[in-house]
Every structure is written in structure tokens, then in C-alpha cells.
């Protein structure tokens, strides 16, 4: 019984150390890109695939969010929601004339990228949309 508990403690310690080391690296990148400790827990959730992304800045017609480093995730998300996705280089345009937002534009920031996360811009011709609103679309 003691060996099992010891093994569980060792595995838990290794996992916790792995998450802490990666969190420190993520925080370093966040600081480099102008963000801080407030964004760290949500960014770690994005890295661990618990979250699809979260808003970090807004403008009149666009939402800037930290999302997953693999942009294909958002392409698949659009397709599951019934959008037709065209990819032009790094930018994606999702269209569906039957939806509230007929076209949604995703653009990853080429300069703000690392293994753990990427900064994206999302906007629509039919009004402002945030990543949270997009996730809730049917």
C-alpha cells in the first residue's frame, strides 16, 4: 500500500513540476508580448486544451484573443458549426449565408506565436463578434 501511495506522489510531483515549468515559460512569452500574470491561468488552460481561447483586447470591429497554437483547431470548429472555411495563407474566412454571422474572419498574428499559444484577431462583416460568442454559436 505504501508503495502505491509513494508512486502516486512521485507521479503527481512530476506532473506538477511539468506544469510549473511550462507555466513559467508561458509567462515569459506573455510578458514579451505585453501581457501579464492576469492572463497566465487562462493561457495555461488554452495550452492544456481546456479552453478554446479568451479575449485580451477589443476594438470597434474586432476581438483579439489568445488561442491555441494550432490554427486548424478553429477551422474544424467553424466546420462543425456549419461554416464553409477558405484559408488564404494564414488567414481564414468562414462563410454561411444561413447563419447570424454570414462571414467570420480569423487572422493569427504571425509575430505573436509560440509553441503554447497564439494571438488571433476575429471579426465579422455582420457586426462585432468575440471568441466567446463564436463558441456559443450553433
Residue ranges and their predicted role:
Residues 2, 48, 114-117:
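Short linear interaction motif-like sites in intrinsically disordered regions of transcription factors
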Residues 39-97:
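Mature extracytoplasmic domains of secretory-pathway proteins
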Residues 1-16:
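N-terminal Sec-pathway targeting helices
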Residues 2, 33-40, 129-138:
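Intrinsically disordered, low-complexity prosegments and terminal tails associated
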Amino acid at each position: 500500500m505504501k508503495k502505491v501511495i509513494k508512486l502516486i506522489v512521485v507521479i503527481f510531483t512530476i506532473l506538477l513540476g511539468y506544469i510549473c515549468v511550462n507555466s513559467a515559460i508561458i509567462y515569459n512569452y506573455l510578458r514579451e508580448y505585453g501581457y501579464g500574470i492576469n492572463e497566465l491561468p487562462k493561457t495555461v488552460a488554452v495550452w492544456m486544451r481546456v479552453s478554446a481561447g479568451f479575449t485580451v483586447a477589443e476594438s470597434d470591429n474586432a476581438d483579439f484573443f489568445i488561442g491555441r497554437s494550432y490554427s486548424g483547431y478553429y477551422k474544424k470548429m467553424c466546420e462543425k458549426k456549419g461554416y464553409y472555411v477558405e484559408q488564404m495563407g494564414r488567414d481564414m474566412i468562414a462563410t454561411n449565408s444561413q447563419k447570424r454571422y454570414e462571414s467570420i474572419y480569423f487572422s493569427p498574428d504571425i509575430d505573436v506565436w509560440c509553441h503554447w499559444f497564439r494571438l488571433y484577431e476575429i471579426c465579422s462583416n455582420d457586426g462585432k463578434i468575440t471568441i466567446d460568442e463564436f463558441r456559443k454559436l450553433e
